[in-house]
From Swiss-Prot:
Family, per entry: Belongs to the UPF0298 family.
Protein name: UPF0298 protein BC_3932
UniProt xrefs under InterPro entries: DUF2129
Subcellular localization, as worded in the UniProt entry: Cytoplasm
Pfam families per record: DUF2129 (PF09902)
UniProt xrefs under NCBIfam families: PRK02886.1
The keyword Ubl conjugation belongs to this UniProt entry's keyword annotation: no
Length: 88
């Protein structure tokens, strides 16, 4: 039902234009102090959206999130203490 989504961090010159970013995806978070917005869009359209957003005059730079490409399943680095003292 839902496609894969990916986030991009859009750095802005001014937050006055942050509402315009709604056209390009779902706004997840806006930082007033650091002047950036986290915008989610479909993975298939991420390159196209980044190209369109770079053309806007109020955008400083855009960074793509690499979370979909990272391994998020971790192994336990320390052994379980309860299993260490199993005497049976």
């Amino acid at each position: 039902m839902f496609g894969q989504r990916q986030s991009m961090i859009v750095y802005l010159h001014s937050l006055k234009h942050a509402k315009i970013l709604r056209k390009y995806g779902n706004i997840h978070y806006i930082s007033k102090r650091l002047k950036y917005a986290v915008v989610y869009c479909d993975m298939e359209q991420i390159e196209h959206m980044m190209h369109k957003l770079n053309k806007l005059p109020f955008v400083k730079k855009i960074e793509q999130s690499y979370r979909p490409y990272l391994k998020t399943e971790f192994e336990n680095s320390r052994p379980d203490r309860a299993k260490e003292y199993d005497y049976s």
